[in-house]
UniProtKB/Swiss-Prot annotation:
InterPro entries assigned to the protein according to its UniProt record, in alphabetical order: LolA/LolB/LppX, OM_lipoprot_carrier_LolA-like, OM_lipoprot_carrier_LolA_Pbac
Keyword Chaperone: yes
Biological role: Participates in the translocation of lipoproteins from the inner membrane to the outer membrane. Only forms a complex with a lipoprotein if the residue after the N-terminal Cys is not an aspartate (The Asp acts as a targeting signal to indicate that the lipoprotein should stay in the inner membrane).
Disulfide bonds, paired cysteine numbers: none
Identification of the protein by name: Outer-membrane lipoprotein carrier protein
NCBIfam families: lolA
Keywords: Chaperone, Periplasm, Protein transport, Signal, Transport
Main location: periplasm
Subunit and partners: Monomer.
A Pfam family of this chain: LolA
Length: 207
């Protein structure tokens, strides 16, 4: 995948072992993701260029609910609000007094937030997945199977069965690290969290 008979036999053996390991990793990740039907947390997000220079640092709060609902609020001074009702996404920029509304892309490779809030039952169709565990932390590395993606690699880390952080790396090596704190799972969430009300006088862009 990515001449003698012995080499061929060795390659086939390795392939079978890798497929078995990957299958176990997929099942474990799916189980960890699906057990949280709702999630709320604070987050801190740090973006670095390929050379490690800091480009941006933000904080905020997220609220997620399966299937496909999320509210991602970034604090001032770079305030933004992204809300999904499961069908469309509204992105509100208060500085510009502008809201952009577009159809929710259900592909996990295009909308990473859906890894935490969407349908992940077929996650292995979109990613090659490997895992490693140490000290109560499980790291899952997801590599998209297609090139039409927002990122080249994504890492999800769980501590004691709860999402702890994630990292995205794009095609030019830019890294986005997101650390979650105060995580609460499976607590009731108001439906209004996922319903965006367009502010009076706002510019509306439909995509």
């Amino acid at each position: 995948m990515r001449l003698i008979r012995m080499l061929l036999a060795t390659a086939l053996t390795f392939s079978v072992m890798s497929a078995h390991a990957d299958s176990k990793d997929v099942a474990r990740l799916t189980q960890l993701l699906e057990k949280s039907q709702t999630l709320t947390a604070r987050f801190s997000q740090l973006t670095l260029d390929g050379g490690g220079t800091q480009l941006q640092e933000t904080t905020g709060e997220m609220t997620l609910q399966r299937p496909g609902l999320f509210n991602w609020h970034t604090d001032a001074p770079q305030e933004q609000l992204m809300v999904s009702d499961g069908k469309k996404v509204s992105l509100w920029d208060p500085d510009l007094e502008q809201v952009t509304i577009k159809k929710l892309d259900q592909r996990l490779t295009q909308t990473p937030a859906l890894l935490l809030s969407g349908d992940v039952s077929k996650i292995s169709e979109s990613f090659d997945i490997t895992a490693k565990e140490a000290g109560g932390v499980i790291d899952f590395v997801l590599k998209p199977k297609t090139k039409d993606t927002l990122f080249d690699s994504l890492r999800l880390s769980f501590r004691n069965g709860i999402i702890n952080d994630m990292q995205l790396i794009d095609s030019v090596g830019q890294r986005t690290n997101i650390l979650f704190t105060g995580v609460k799972a499976n607590e009731p969430v108001a439906a209004s969290k996922f319903q965006f009300q367009i502010p009076k006088g706002a510019d509306v862009i439909q995509e």
